[in-house]
């Protein structure tokens, strides 16, 4: 989130004392630079629960800080390198998404950063209910706005006066801290709107993809089917008992794969990325081999090698029951 607010906030002593060490360790483990709000949000949670900051939101919101936050708690000490990108990676999480907060286990609710480019700062914070669907909801530009969005939504549903009071108290503290640090609490900001204009396709997960397109309009070409048509095609392949219909749908998918090959030859790498992510979001293991034909290559062609590695690791371990890789 390069554009956190209209004003460049001044660094304060609320930042973690060992932040430089944490930054280095997270970079080594996750190959990612975390935005400032990641550390400031930890400091905010430390104020709420000095002993266990990761559990500061548990009683009121049922949320726990996880993922790279586990570096700060020491939970990832001794973890094998191959496991870092699987740590709290849910079933429908694309490589662009990194979980930092987990919630309702019944629905698989979790919150994380979304990056278009692996080495860039996140473009927004999103949430997903992994046991409900692949769709992601943009809930803010930083973790303060994301939590504020969650609190506001919870206040609409909760009738218990005591719970409402606790939520309002936390929201007041959150708003005060966000204003102090000059973080926007808006769900949609100018930076997010600007990014939306660059989105080539929303994809089935709705967070969208952004790939560079040059002045000659080379870089992306749309799929030749709509989302609805693609889902119908994939559903026919996986569920239909009619062999003729199944074969027809399989031929249609093969045609799409051929179009992607043509697109790659002509520099439109975004088409393979879109189709690969849509197959991933559909969720059937039947398409895992096809996804492996599409996504690693698309990411490599786009210079996003880290994402190629993540999708391969994820598909190999997608059905695992234990999402935490910590011992």
From Swiss-Prot:
InterPro entries per the UniProt record, alphabetical: HPF1
Protein's cellular compartments: Chromosome; Nucleus
Recorded GO MF terms: histone binding; poly-ADP-D-ribose binding
GO biological process terms, semicolon-separated: DNA repair-dependent chromatin remodeling; double-strand break repair
Active-site residues, record numbering mapped to chain: 266
Any one annotated GO CC term: chromosome
Pfam families assigned to the protein according to its UniProt record, in alphabetical order: HPF1
Primary location: nucleus
Annotated keywords: Chromosome, Nucleus
UniProt function note: Cofactor for serine ADP-ribosylation that confers serine specificity on PARP. Switches the amino acid specificity of PARP from aspartate or glutamate to serine residues. Acts by completing the active site of PARP: forms a composite active site composed of residues from HPF1 and PARP.
Protein name: Histone PARylation factor 1
Organism, as annotated: Nematostella vectensis
């Amino acid at each position: 989130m390069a554009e956190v607010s209209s004003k460049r906030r001044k660094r304060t002593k609320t930042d973690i004392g060992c932040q430089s060490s944490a930054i280095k360790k997270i970079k080594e483990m996750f190959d990612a630079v975390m935005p400032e709000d990641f550390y400031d949000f930890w400091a905010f949670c430390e104020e709420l629960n000095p002993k266990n900051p990761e559990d500061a939101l548990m009683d009121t919101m049922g949320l726990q800080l996880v993922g790279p936050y586990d570096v700060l708690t020491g939970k990832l000490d001794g973890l094998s390198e191959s496991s870092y990108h699987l740590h709290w990676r849910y079933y429908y999480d694309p490589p662009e998404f990194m979980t930092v907060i987990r919630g309702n286990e019944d629905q698989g609710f979790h919150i994380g950063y979304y990056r278009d480019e692996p080495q860039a700062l996140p473009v927004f914070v999103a949430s997903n209910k992994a046991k409900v669907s692949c769709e992601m909801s943009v809930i803010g530009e930083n973790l303060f706005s994301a939590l504020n969005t969650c609190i506001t939504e919870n206040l609409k549903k909760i009738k218990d006066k005591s719970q409402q009071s606790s939520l309002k108290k936390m929201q007041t503290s959150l708003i005060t801290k966000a204003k102090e640090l000059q973080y926007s609490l808006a769900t949609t900001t100018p930076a997010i709107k600007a990014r939306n204009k660059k989105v080539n396709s929303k994809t089935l997960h709705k967070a969208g993809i952004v790939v560079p397109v040059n002045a000659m309009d080379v870089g992306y070409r749309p799929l030749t089917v709509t989302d609805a048509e693609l889902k119908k095609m994939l559903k026919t392949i996986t569920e239909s008992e009619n062999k003729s219909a199944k074969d027809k749908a399989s031929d249609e998918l093969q045609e799409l794969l051929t179009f992607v090959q043509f697109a790659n030859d002509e520099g439109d790498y975004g088409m393979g990325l879109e189709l690969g992510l849509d197959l991933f979001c559909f969720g059937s293991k039947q398409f895992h081999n096809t996804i492996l034909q599409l996504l690693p290559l698309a990411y490599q062609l786009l210079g996003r090698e880290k994402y190629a590695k993540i999708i391969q690791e994820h598909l190999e371990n997608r059905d695992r029951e234990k999402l935490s890789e910590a011992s």
